[in-house]
Amino acid sequence: METLRIMSGKIVIKGAREHNLQNVDLELPRDKFIVITGISGSGKSSLAFDTIYAEGQRRYVESLSAYARQFLGQMKKPEMDYIEGLSPAISIDQKTTRVNPRSTVGTITEIYDYLRLLFARIGKPHCYLCGREIEQQTSTQIVDRIMDDGEGERIIILAPVVRDRKGEHQRVFERLREQGFVRVRVDGEIHDLEDEFDLDRNRKHSIDVVVDRLVVRRDTEFRKRLADSVETALQLGEGTVRVPSTMTPGEERIYSEHFACPGTAGINFEEISPRMFSFNSPHGACPECNGLGSKLEIDPDLVVPYPERSINEGAIVPWSKSGKRDNYYHQMLRAVAEHYGFSLDTPFRDLDEEHRRAILYGTDEKIQFVFQRKNRTYRVNRRFEGVIPRMERIYMETKSNYMRTYIGRFMSNHACPVCGGSRLRPESLSVTINGRSIHDVVEMSIREAHEFFDSLKLTEREEYIAREVLKEIRERLRFLIDVGLDYLTLSRSSGTLSGGEAQRIRLATQIGSGLVGVLYILDEPSIGLHQRDNRRLIETLKRLRDLGNTLIVVEHDEETILSADHVVDIGPGAGEHGGCVVAEGTPEEIMEDPDSLTGAYLSGRETIPLPEVRRRPSGRYLTVRGAAENNLREIDVRIPLGLFTCVTGVSGSGKSTLVNDILYRGVYERLNHKHMNAGRHTDIEGLQHIDKVVMIDQSPIGRTPRSNPATYTGVFTHIRELFAQTPEARKRGYRPGRFSFNVKGGRCEACGGDGIIKIEMHFLADVYVPCEVCRGRRYNEETLEIRYRGRNIAEVLDMTVEEALEFFENIPQVRRKLQTLYDVGLGYIKLGQPATTLSGGEAQRVKLAKELSRRSTGSTLYILDEPTTGLHFDDIKKLLNVLGRLVDAGNTAVVIEHNLDVIKSADHIIDLGPEGGERGGLVVAEGTPEEVAASGTHTGRFLREVLADERSQKVPVGQDTG
C-alpha cells in the first residue's frame, strides 16, 4: 500500500490531532515545493514538524535494532489515524547549532575536511623559522646531521612502526622478533621484545623499534655503522627515523626522507597528512590552546570594570562581594597600600601603573600583613600573590562548582598567544598553496574563498591530483553563496550563528550531499535574509526539489509563498480557534479563496497600511560613537529618541553587532553598572534621556513546564492572592503560597507540581502520563477545594486568556495584565500553558505584553531583533500596533528587521552596508522610509517598490515626539 502511495505521488494524512490540529485530512503532492502558512499558533509546526517529520523520523528509528534505538532520540507517535507515502525525513529548523567551540562553518559544511585533504596532497611545506621551502632528505643527509652531534653523545636510532593507532598490535611484535630485533619503545618506554605485551585495544599506541644504540664518533667505521642503521630504520619506518638523546631526556629529533628544512634551522616534518591540518587532532592542534584558538583567562577589565571607583568603593569586584571593609581580602589590600604608600580612597585608574600592577599581579617584595579575627591579631611577612594569580589558583584547585562559576564570571577568551587564534601548529600553518596557508583560506569570506579557488594556478600534476577535491570545494562554496551566506568566513564559530544562518548552512550542506527521494521540512529559511538574497534562496530550494525531493516549508514570506508549487493555509485562528486547513492549492487558488486570510493579504484585499502620519524627531538622540566591533568601521550612529527606528541592511552588514553587541550591552552596562562585555565603541551619548533598556527577543519565557504566561506576566501572583482572600482559605489559614505549584504545601507532592510523570522507556521514546494522584491538576485535594466564583485554581489555569478576561473583569490589576495579552493577539493561549510549548513568536508577544502592562516611564529603550520571525501578515499588523503603543507612550523602539511591511511603517531607518562582511559596516542611508527609498542602497531599491505600490504621495510627517 505504502509503495503504491509513493508511486501515485502523494503523501496522505488522515485524522491528524497533534496539539491543536482538529482531525486534519490532507493530501500533499510528492516531489514538489510545498509551503505551509497561517497565523502564529494556528498549527503549522504541529502539522509539519510534530506530525509529518515526527512520524517519518519515528519510522526510520523503529527500523533499527532495539540496541541502536536506545542511543537515539526516539520521537513519540503523533496523534493521528495514519500517514501514507512518507519518504525518509530530514528536518532543517531554526535551532542554532550546538555551541561547540570546535565547530565552525567549515567543519559543519565539510569544506574544511576537503581543505585538509587538498593541503595534504598539493601543499608546499615551508620552514616556519626561516621561511624556506622544505626539501626531502636523503639517508646521506640524515647521517651527516647526526654526525654533527657532539662526540661522545649517546643516541638511539628508532624506526616508527605504529603511530597513534588503536589495537593490541601482537602481530607487529611477532614480526619484529622474527626479523631479529631485540628492543622496542612502546608509548615512550623501552622494553625487551621477549617481554609479554598486553596493550589496551581501545587506546591509541605508538611503537618504535630500536635499530641501534650508539655513541657518536668521527671515524669511518662509526659512519658506516650509522649509515647501515639509518638505512634499516628508514626502511622499517617508511622514510622516517627518530633519534632521541639519552643525555637530554625528552629531546627527540625526527628525520625524514620526505621533508626537512635545508637551512640552519633544521626543522623536520613528519609526513604531511590531512590530520596535520585538523585542530581536533593532536597532530595538528596548537599544543598551547589544544586547537581552540583561544584561552580562557582572568580578564583585568572584568576584575576592575569601573576604574573610576576606589578600592574602598569596590573597584575590585571579586574581592568586594561581601561589602565589608574588615574582610580578609580588604585587610590584605590595606597592607599592600601601606607598604607602597598609596590610598585605598584613590580612584583605581589614578593609581601609579606600578601600584595597579602590584594589586592585580602581585609582588616579589615581602609585605607585613596584619589580620584581625575574633578580637585576635595575626602578623605575617610574605609576598603578595596578587588578585588575578590568586583567582587563577583557586579556579584550578577548587572542587566547588559554585566557586568555579563565580570566578568564571571574571574570565574571557583571549586569542592564543602561540597560534594567534589559528588553532594549528606552526608546521601546519607553514604549508601553503599559491602562497596561502589553510588558516589564510578559512579567514577569507566565502565569496573571497570561492574567487581564490576559481583563480587557483596549479601545475599539470597538481591539477590532476586535486581535480576532484577542488570540484567539491567550489560546489559547496557556491551553494553557500546561493543561500545568501557569502559574507561568512569558514572559520566562523557555529555558536555565533543566528538561527537563520545555521539553517541555511544545513540547507547548503544537504544540497551538497546530493540526496534524492528525501522529504525535507524547513522552518522559515528566509529569516535573517535580505530581500536581495531571497530570490537566490528560492532558486536553491527549487534546485533541491528538482533533484527529486519533496520540500515542506513553514513560511510567511510573500515571495516564497508565491514561488511554491502548492500552498496549505492553516487557521482560521490560533490555538483552539485554529488547527484546520482553511485553503490549499496553487498560490493563485489561495489568493482567490475568500476564506483564506493569507490569500487576502497576497491578493491585496487585506494590507498592512502605511502609517497615517510619521512621528518627527524631538531633537533628542542616543548616539553611538566609534562603533568598531567585527566589521563595523568606526562609525557614529544617531538614534532619535521617542521614535520607532528600523536598522536594516543586507545579511552580514553589521546590524546585530551594532544593535545587540554595542547598543544594548553598552547602554545596559552604563545604566545598571554591570559589565556585559559590550562590543568595541568609543562612547554612547544621550543616556540621560532613558532610564532602562529592555531586549525583547524570541527566546523562551522559561526553560521548564513550570513557567507559563501567568507566572511570567505576574498575573498569577494576583490570582493566588484572590484565592487566599476567599472565606474558606482564610478560615483554613491558607496564604498565597498555598496556591503555588512550585513550593510544598498546596501542590501535589506525587508529581512535584508538574501534573505529569515521566516514565523512561530506554530504547523507546520516554512516556509522559498524567499524575494518578492529582490527575494532571498539579495541586492536592485540599487546595482544590478552595473556589473563587465557583472555580478552583487548576480550572483558572486551564482558562484561555479570552475566558479569563471575562472571568476577572471586575479585578482591575488582573484584567489590565490579561488585556495586554489579548491585545497582542494571544487571547487563545491558556494561562497555565507550559512555556516550552510556546512558539518563538508567542514567547516574544508574551514579553511585549508584560512590558505593555507596566506603568510606563516614557523613557525606556526597547530593542527587538527580527520580531517578525514566525509571524503571519496579520500577526505583523498586531505587532506594529503594540510597538506603536509603546512608542506613543514616549518610549524608543529599535528593531532589526528585513520585513518590508515593518520597515515601511518605521519613523526612522538606519541602513547599513553596502554589502556583507568586510564590504559592510557603514551607514549607507538614514532617514524616513521615503528618504531611504530615494537612495541607491539595496534596501532603498526594494522599499521604493513597496511604497510605490501602496501610495504615490509621501506620508506626512507629524508633530514632534517631545
Curated annotation (Swiss-Prot):
One of its GO terms (cellular component) is cytoplasm. ATP binds at residues 38-45, 649-656. A zinc finger (C4-type) spans 748-774. Residues 319-597, 617-944 form the ABC transporter domain. One of its GO terms (molecular function) is zinc ion binding. SUPFAM superfamilies: P-loop containing nucleoside triphosphate hydrolases. PROSITE patterns: ABC_TRANSPORTER_1 (PS00211), ABC_TRANSPORTER_2 (PS50893). NCBIfam families: PRK00349.1 (NF001503), uvra (TIGR00630). Forms a heterotetramer with UvrB during the search for lesions. Belongs to the ABC transporter superfamily. UvrA family. This is UvrABC system protein A. It comes from Methanothermobacter thermautotrophicus (strain ATCC 29096 / DSM 1053 / JCM 10044 / NBRC 100330 / Delta H). The gene is uvrA.
